[in-house]
């Protein structure tokens, strides 16, 4: 009967809503907004969201979504894109994962207007991910020999690499935790990432690159503010990338990327063509970022180079 069919359709619709769960709790913003102006200017945000934004996990991510909407990035690079603790601070099981990140990243990203997502090699609880208003071409997921991995994507002719280097003083795999090999391991991670991306001969024709994320290491540009540290990671990076965007934009200043205000370990590097188009740079300080993570987000606006491959 018509009434039975109507009831069946209603039940199916209700079931679909339940499957969407917490990530569909708020209406999705419209996705890509095509237009010449948007295609020419990119607003990039890089953020280590700390344990898959565990801070707002039990609020249906409503505050996080509202905050991302106010920032309105075109491209969003995220470190620690997995939730691995449930509300009882127990490890999230495989059965629970569809409720959380990264399994439901696409549903969460839709809420802030990004219909496109990409997830790096999910080899531990700290994957890197991208969300975007524009189509994402996944060039490669880089995991071998790395702790948290790296993700290389291409969006509108620009190459983006997001990474998260090893955070400890000791090297990965050292069970004694006393070898003090952490920095050497980070250098090897960076060497692998550079060799796979910007230094790879097969990408010789690619001129426009950005590399970002949590480097867990210090820059020589900040030596006047914190004294001498080990700069091997960034010396290696600077041999391939000409600009540390925050360090060069705020030349002569110390702009920490941690909420504690004592360290700059999150970076966005770029090549000359990108740097020439940079219009705005900001490390975001507000009521949300003061509490949501131990890292602060970095926002960069740049004009897309005219010639992109």
Segments from the language model and where they lie:
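Serine residues within intrinsically disordered or low-complexity segments
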Residues: 1-3
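Secondary-structure boundary/capping positions in well-ordered alpha/beta enzyme cores
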Residues: 74-75, 115, 240, 244
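Short beta-strand and adjacent tight-turn residues that come in two discontinuous sequence segments
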Residues: 78, 119, 270
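N-terminal, active-site-proximal structural segment of metallo-dependent hydrolase catalytic domains
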Residues: 5, 9, 15, 25-110, ...
């Amino acid at each position: 009967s018509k009434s039975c069919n109507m009831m069946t359709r209603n039940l199916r619709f209700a079931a679909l809503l339940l499957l969407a769960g917490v990530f569909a709790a708020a209406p999705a913003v419209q996705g890509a907004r095509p237009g010449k102006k948007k295609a020419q200017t990119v607003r990039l945000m890089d953020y280590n969201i700390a344990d898959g934004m565990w801070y707002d996990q039990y609020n249906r991510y409503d505050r996080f979504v509202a905050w991302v909407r106010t920032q309105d990035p075109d491209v969003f690079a995220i470190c620690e894109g997995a939730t691995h603790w449930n509300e009882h601070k127990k490890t999230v099981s495989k059965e629970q994962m569809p409720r959380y990140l990264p399994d439901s990243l696409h549903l969460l990203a839709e809420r802030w207007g990004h219909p496109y997502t990409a997830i790096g090699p999910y080899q531990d609880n700290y994957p890197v991910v991208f969300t975007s208003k524009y189509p994402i071409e996944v060039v490669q997921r880089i995991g071998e020999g790395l702790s948290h991995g790296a993700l290389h994507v291409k969006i509108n002719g620009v190459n983006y690499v997001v990474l998260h280097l090893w955070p400890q003083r000791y090297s990965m795999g050292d069970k004694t935790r006393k070898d003090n090999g952490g920095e050497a391991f980070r250098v090897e991670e960076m060497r692998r990432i550079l060799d796979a991306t910007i230094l790879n001969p097969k990408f010789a024709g690619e001129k426009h690159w950005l590399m970002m994320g949590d480097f867990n290491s210090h820059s020589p540009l900040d030596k006047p503010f914190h004294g001498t540290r080990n700069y091997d990671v960034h010396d290696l990076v600077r041999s391939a990338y000409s600009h540390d965007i925050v360090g060069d934009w705020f030349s002569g200043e110390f702009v920490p990327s941690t909420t504690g205000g004592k360290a700059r370990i999150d970076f966005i590097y770029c090549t000359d063509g990108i740097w020439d188009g940079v219009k705005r740079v900001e490390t975001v300080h507000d009521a949300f970022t003061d509490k949501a993570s131990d890292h602060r987000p970095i926002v960069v606006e740049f004009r897309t180079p005219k010639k992109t491959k």
